[in-house]
Amino acid sequence: MNREKSTQLFAEAQHYIPGGVNSPVRAFKSVGGNPVYIEKGEGSRIFDVDGNSYIDYIGSWGPLILGHAHPRVLAAITEVAALGTSFGAPTERETEMAKLVCEIVPSVEVVRMVNSGTEATMSALRLARGYTRRNKIMKFEGCYHGHADSLLIKAGSGVATLGLPDSPGVPEGTAHNTITVPYNDLESVKLAFEAFGDDLAAVIVEPIGGNMGVVPPQPGFLEGLREITEKHGTLLIFDEVMTGFRVALGGAQELYGITPDLTTMGKVIGGGLPVGAYGGKREIMQQVAPAGPIYQAGTLSGNPLAMAAGLTTLQELSKPGAYERLEKMSARLAEGLADNAKKLGIPHTLNRVGSMVCLFFTETPVINYETAKTSDLERFSAYFSYLLEEGVMIPPSQFEGMFVSLAHTDEDIERTIEASYQAMKKAFK
């Protein structure tokens, strides 16, 4: 494929934008080569500036569960934009959106709209600290919750350690209040609570790990977290920025039947526009200003365009059969990818929950960040590049899952499986 114009645009961008991109994974650093510059999207496909077409499994990193340029979403945005893009004042759609989210998500009685997943998690943690009057939080290795200082923490040695900054610029004092333990490891959680339980304000977790590939919770893991946090008076926060409205209409908490105290949301909730949200029990959420003393604000929070796109997306997803179709297509895709690897004798593990799919090039069952890191990253890079040449766009990282949308067709899935076979064959020759 010719991608000459993309190469030229990336070279120019690097003069004006750090690394040439506005979010690091877009630079293709982990897979080599230059990023593809996109001109437009339509349904299940994206088209680059050089005229190439790709079946897309990135979907803007998850939000576009209806596919690109969905007619109803575009119509809603166009209608609202004609009336004004932002007012800095309440609108009727904000309440409509909040009401629908409260009806859909089991844990949410009251919800506050923000502009990103990072804002949502940052605000939820401040709320948890203010509500419990405690300082420390627990997170899990390999779970990404946005780029707020207290969440950019990696685990040290031992069962549970006080965090060390995972990025320059994160103060050690901030890191000191973040406890990191391995995902899917209840024994480590219990030991951490023995050491720090009296000062743990919250445990924040991706109920399905989505930033180390796709890593489902082991049986009993989420139930154990719920039991332990209740015992210690610690809030349980589900970060459903990725899983919310994707693995089920009510998110992972509906799928697994576990109700957290607070939930953070993003991606799908905005229908492709910048939206985040956090919500939960009324008595906790009533502590947020102006109802309570815990401050959080946003100039563009709940803006009309975002509410129109998000509301329309959730209405479409509420229609009968939506998740059954996603499940059918995603199951076929996962089956086809795994069959290809088996036929070619390639070491692999295939993880899937709903329309989140990840093929790891390792024989080791992937249950946490350490096991995810056993994947053959060099082979993945080659696989990615060959797949791109076949006209299939997957995330340019072994540690990001594929997203299936309602716009994908049976033909798209079969073409992807066929392309995957050829790409694997070349990558492992």
Curated annotation (Swiss-Prot):
Name the top EC class.
isomerase
Give the pathway listed in the UniProt entry for this protein. Answer: Porphyrin-containing compound metabolism; protoporphyrin-IX biosynthesis; 5-aminolevulinate from L-glutamyl-tRNA(Glu): step 2/2
Which reaction is catalysed here? (S)-4-amino-5-oxopentanoate = 5-aminolevulinate
Under the GO molecular function aspect, what terms does this record hold?
Answer: glutamate-1-semialdehyde 2,1-aminomutase activity; pyridoxal phosphate binding; transaminase activity
Q: Which Pfam families match?
A: Aminotran_3
Give TM segment ranges.
Answer: none
UniProt entry keywords in alphabetical sequence: Cytoplasm, Isomerase, Porphyrin biosynthesis, Pyridoxal phosphate
Which InterPro entries does the record associate with it? 4pyrrol_synth_GluAld_NH2Trfase, Aminotrans_3, Aminotrans_3_PPA_site, PyrdxlP-dep_Trfase, PyrdxlP-dep_Trfase_major, PyrdxlP-dep_Trfase_small
Its EC number(s)? 5.4.3.8
GO terms under biological process? protoporphyrinogen IX biosynthetic process
Q: Where in the cell is it found?
A: Cytoplasm
The record's listing under PROSITE patterns reads: AA_TRANSFER_CLASS_3 (PS00600)
Give the record's GO CC terms: cytoplasm
Q: Which residues carry this modification: N6-(pyridoxal phosphate)lysine?
A: 267
HAMAP family according to UniProt: HemL_aminotrans_3
Name the family the entry cites.
Answer: Belongs to the class-III pyridoxal-phosphate-dependent aminotransferase family. HemL subfamily.
Subunit and partners: Homodimer.
Q: What is this protein called?
A: Glutamate-1-semialdehyde 2,1-aminomutase 2
Q: Which organism is it from?
A: Brevibacillus brevis (strain 47 / JCM 6285 / NBRC 100599)
